[in-house]
Amino acid sequence: MSAPKNEMYYSLLEWFKTLNLNAPHADAESLADGVALAQALNQFAPESFTDAWLSKIKASAVGSNWRLRMSNLKKVTQSVYDYYSDVLNYSLSDFSKPDLQSIAEKCDLGELERLLQLVLGCAVNCAEKQSYITEIMCLEEELQANIMRALQELEATRQASSAEGGVVSSLSRSPRTGILDSKAVQEDRDALAQKCFETEKKMLLLIDEKTNLQQELHKLQQEFARLEQHSTVIGDDGVSLGPVQSGSVRYNELRRQLDLLKEELLQSEGAREDLKLKAQQQDTDLLHMQMRIEELMKSSAEVTTLKDEVDVLRESNDKLKICEAQLDTYKKKLEDYNDLKKQVKILEERSADYVQQNAQFEEDAKRYANTKGQVELFKKEIQDLHAKLDAESSKNVKLEFDNKNLDGKNLALQRAKDSLLKERDNLREAVDELKCGQLSSNTALTGTTVSRELQPSATVEKLQRLEAENKALREGQGGQTALAQLLDDANKRCENLREQLKTANERILSLSHASQSDDPILKESEFGKQIKQLMELNEQKTLQLEEAVTQSTSLQCKVTQLETNLSAREQEILVYDAKYRKCVEKAKEVIKSIDPRIASALDASVLEKSADLVEDEPKPKMSVMEEQLMTSAFYRLGVNAQRDAIDSKLAILMGSGQTFLARQRQSAPRKSLSAMKSK
């Protein structure tokens, strides 16, 4: 089928002119800008060639600006190729792509023919293809033939036929896999639809050819009838052919024409029968294809249902994964909850221990509060002892001064003694009898006076006071060992006082005898004894003061240590209490997040447990060692205080304003137990 050059282009242009477009599309120059082609594609498939895509085509790309036309043609060609591959599933790999540059610059008709051929394929494959096919059928026969040839060339390049057979055979061999592969089913359905469309086009062409042959046959029959009616026929050269008789030239010519027409008629009848058979075969194929399409539609419905089921299963799988993740988190939370339970139990035990320790600390604090009062008393007593120490130190200075004076006097007396020894030897024999008589009378008188003076004033008062103190101690501390010790100490002191009273009486007698005799040796010995006694008293006082100071310092150290321990214990209790509360709050929050009913039940159980622990908690008892230490310290303090009071009273009685004899009549202050033990 050879055709003149660019005949297909003009046929396609005539078809393109039938489209109702806004842009000019009457010649090649108007089509070279791509605007009319874009509008036609938008009219064919608006879902693929959208208005937004159409707005990208620049309508001002006319004139000499071939680059703008090139840009528009590139957009149109790329969109057409995408439409063929994505929507129609056509492969245009064998179809030569039109040269857009030659179209934009030179308006090349051959390249524009290829582009119009692609646009024609979009028209006959779109959703409104039937209307466009009817418009093509309304054109002239030559135009229809050229358009059909263009479509056949375009169909020849499609590479989906082989894939069609493979898909159908695979679907027939394994229907289950074809059902699951929805894409293959869709491609198969599109291929069958395309094949049906092709058969329809072929049927239309065959019908048209049949009508044409019938028309030609009718014309020939009319011509034959006309020739038979006329007896004479003039040929082309103007010569009469003569009547139609056998053997004549005209008869032979007509016979030859009739044979040719019969042969052509037979050929046409054979072609018609072939076409009938082909049409029947195509009808059967069409029925099979329709049945296949129905089966594929059913399979596609099943595929959609299976897809829905797969989506449901996928969603359920996702939900299962989420639930598994939540289950893992809940397991971790449960493990954390069990750990928190264990920690809460440990903290409850610790809190119970801390409550017991707190109660013990409170009792210790109460005891320490009592000891604080005693410490304050000890401090006051220490201050008094310091004052006494100062007084004793001043007395010691005075005694040292008196000792120095007595040393001077002792030297003077020693000198007088040496001078008087000689006189004593001379006068001893003469004065001996007189001296003895005077001594006897004086001793009797002085003994009675001393006994009379000392008996009511010193001893009786001291004995009464000691008995009263002993009685008060017995009544206050009834029947304890420390009071018995105090009583023994008081009795010992009474005996010591009596012995001191006897020694004082003897001293008084000796001093009175020495004063009467005016013997410097005796005076010196008496003064030495007094100095020794004063030194002993001074040493005793210093020892007592040192013991009191050491005891007070040790007590202060103990009190400070106990206070620091108590404060540290209180701080520890506060810290542990805060930690316990935080842990309990965290545990409550975790339990509330899991289940608020469990949290309320646990709160009630915790309160009951804490109440039971407080009720069943045994009160801490003081240890035996602590009781013994407290009692011994208390009685030691009482003994020391009583001793200091007695010593202070004795010191007051032994004032500096009394005479030598009055001071000698008073009992000497008692020595401390530590001094007695050291001696």
Swiss-Prot record:
One of its GO terms (biological process) is cytoskeleton-dependent intracellular transport. Residues 6-123 form the Calponin-homology (CH) domain. GO terms for cellular component: centrosome; endosome; microtubule; synapse. InterPro entries: CH_dom, CH_dom_sf, Hook_C, HOOK_N. The keyword Coiled coil applies. Residues 135-437, 480-574 form a coiled coil. It is found in: Cytoplasm, Cytoskeleton; Endosome; Synapse. Its main location: cytoplasm. GO terms for molecular function: dynein light intermediate chain binding; microtubule binding; small GTPase binding. Belongs to the hook family. Homodimer. Interacts with microtubules via its N-terminus. The coiled coil domain mediates homodimerization. Involved in endocytic trafficking by stabilizing organelles of the endocytic pathway. Probably acts as a cytoskeletal linker protein required to tether endosome vesicles to the cytoskeleton. Involved in modulation of endocytosis at stages required for down-regulation of membrane proteins that control synapse size. Not involved in synaptic vesicle recycling. Required in R7 cells for boss endocytosis into multivesicular bodies (MVBs). Has a role in regulating adult longevity. This is Protein hook.
